[in-house]
From Swiss-Prot:
CDD domains xref list: MATE_eukaryotic
Compartment(s): Membrane
Keyword Mitochondrion included in the entry's annotation: no
Protein name: Protein DETOXIFICATION 18
GO CC annotation terms, alphabetical: membrane
PANTHER family cross-referenced by the UniProt entry: MULTIDRUG RESISTANCE PROTEIN
Membrane topology term: Multi-pass membrane protein
Length: 469
């Protein structure tokens, strides 16, 4: 007698097979798993390092209104002129080390790391000189004199940490391109914990007050760099890619510059666009409300981008590794999966914002006016977060392929020739205020994402020459 459940079991298995086939057609599951497993540690790593200077600002902010304004202004200035630039410079290694690892030119990874550190050292000196004129620059920009003086004091003691941050970013890219990412979570979390304790000790126990916060940040960044550096030197995982210091690294500085400067420009042009929006908001009627709304939106976008950064790093590594191995088809497949994952990621964040916007804005302000204003902006913010997620992944493709120069031109044109003029027109001329500013940003981001997508589709995919990787 036949088993009466056999047909049901067969139908159930057939249904599962159909479902599995549909998912496989929609997205390469194995590639998606690889990228997700890789992205998660990078998300936490980026978040922990991001929180080191932020926690110091929080401690300084507790000392008074002047200290709050000075520390916040200093941190913003340090980010757009220093930390973001250093992060961008390290993007050269995503191309050089990523493709070198794929091509099995393992020794060259250590050489490129040293070249990148030389470049970081030179630019750190130049940026530090700029930082020592912070007060004059702020006064030139018509900032409050007392706040400018306080911010300049903060920058003075933050400057020693910039070099450590630059070196740290280079080592992160060096590890990232070899798919060694899980240990990075521990090496980023420990300095954050140390920074919290050090900041409290210097600000409150040692009696250093305001300057204790930036000193703690500098100390913590050096601890982060030295600890990760020792890990690379001592671990057997890097025995083929780190063979010691070499004078050969100086021969590759020019090559590094051809990629690192456009990569830094890519990052900074986008960072600066958001800062300009906050500045424009301060020029409007009711600047306290408009600035607060735009600042909350910018902070929300930045936090959301932390998630995209992890996926962008995974995309860059997968693309550069495949190109280095001569597998263009594999690189394109990785890109396709990354773009789909970016849409899923954006959808999750957007749903959270649309559903929980009231609770979210409550973390920043209890004002009913601010809450109502943010509610009216939430759909615009959802659009920009979606576009930012897509462009973040496509920018990762550009870094993996070595297309930084073209991507820089795209960012310059879309943000400053399209986005900003529309922001000014809608915000001031059409009197849409904060909405108008964000509409301009969305227009710029849409053009940016579309341009990067067209570049990805139509540009020829080739690896760098064997001599460079």
């Amino acid at each position: 007698m036949a088993d009466p459940t056999s047909k049901d079991d067969h139908d159930g298995e057939g249904g599962r097979d159909k479902s599995s086939t549909f998912v496989q057609k929609l997205i390469d599951v194995e590639e998606a798993k690889t990228q997700i497993i890789y992205s998660l540690p990078m998300i936490f790593t980026n978040l922990f390092y991001y929180c080191i200077p932020l926690t110091s600002v929080m401690f300084a902010s507790q000392l008074g209104q002047l200290e709050l304004a000075g520390a916040t202004l200093a941190n913003s200035w340090a980010t757009v002129t220093g930390f973001a630039f250093m992060t961008g410079l390290s993007g050269a290694l995503e191309t050089l080390c990523g493709q070198g690892f794929g091509a099995k030119s393992y020794r060259m990874l250590g050489i490129h790391l040293q070249s990148s550190c030389i470049v970081s050292l030179v630019f750190t000196i130049l940026i530090t000189i700029l930082w020592f004129f912070t007060e004059s620059v702020f006064l030139l920009l018509r900032q409050d004199p007392s706040i400018s003086k306080q911010a300049a004091l903060y920058m003075k003691y933050l400057a020693p940490g910039l070099l450590a941050y630059g070196f740290l970013q280079n080592i992160l890219r060096f590890c990232q391109t070899q798919c060694i990412v899980t240990p990075l979570v521990l090496f980023s979390f420990l300095p954050l914990v140390i920074n919290i304790g050090t900041t409290y000790a210097l600000v409150h126990l040692a009696g250093l007050g305001f300057i204790g916060a930036p000193i703690a940040t500098s100390i913590s960044l050096w601890i982060a760099f030295v600890s990760l550096g020792f890990y690379v030197i001592c671990s057997d995982k890097f025995k083929e890619t780190w063979t010691g210091f070499s004078m050969e690294s100086f021969h590759h500085v020019v090559l590094n510059l051809t990629l690192s400067i456009p990569s830094a420009a890519m990052v900074c042009l986008e960072y600066w666009a958001f800062e300009i929006l906050v500045f424009l908001a301060g020029l409007m009627r009711n600047p306290e409300i408009t600035t607060s709304l735009v600042a909350i939106c910018v902070n929300t976008e930045s936090i959301s981008y932390m998630l995209t950064c992890g996926l962008s790093a995974a995309t860059s590594t997968r693309v550069s590794n495949e190109l280095g191995a001569g597998n263009v088809k594999g690189a394109k497949k990785a890109t396709s999966v990354s773009v789909k994952l970016s849409l899923v990621l954006a959808l999750g964040v957007v749903i959270a914002i649309l559903v929980g916007h009231d609770a979210w804005v409550g973390l920043f302000s209890n004002s009913h006016v601010i809450k109502e204003g943010f509610a009216s902006l939430r759909f615009f913010l959802a659009a920009s977060i979606t576009l930012d997620s897509i462009q973040g992944v496509l920018s990762g493709v550009a870094r993996g392929c070595g297309w930084q120069r073209l991507a820089t031109v795209i960012n310059l044109g879309t943000f400053y020739l399209i986005g900003m003029p529309i922001s000014v027109l809608c915000g001031f001329k059409l009197k849409l205020h904060a909405k108008g500013l964000w509409i301009g940003l969305i227009c710029g981001m849409f053009c940016q994402s579309a341009s990067l997508l067209l570049m990805t589709i139509f540009r020829k995919w080739t690896k760098l020459t064997a001599a460079t990787v």
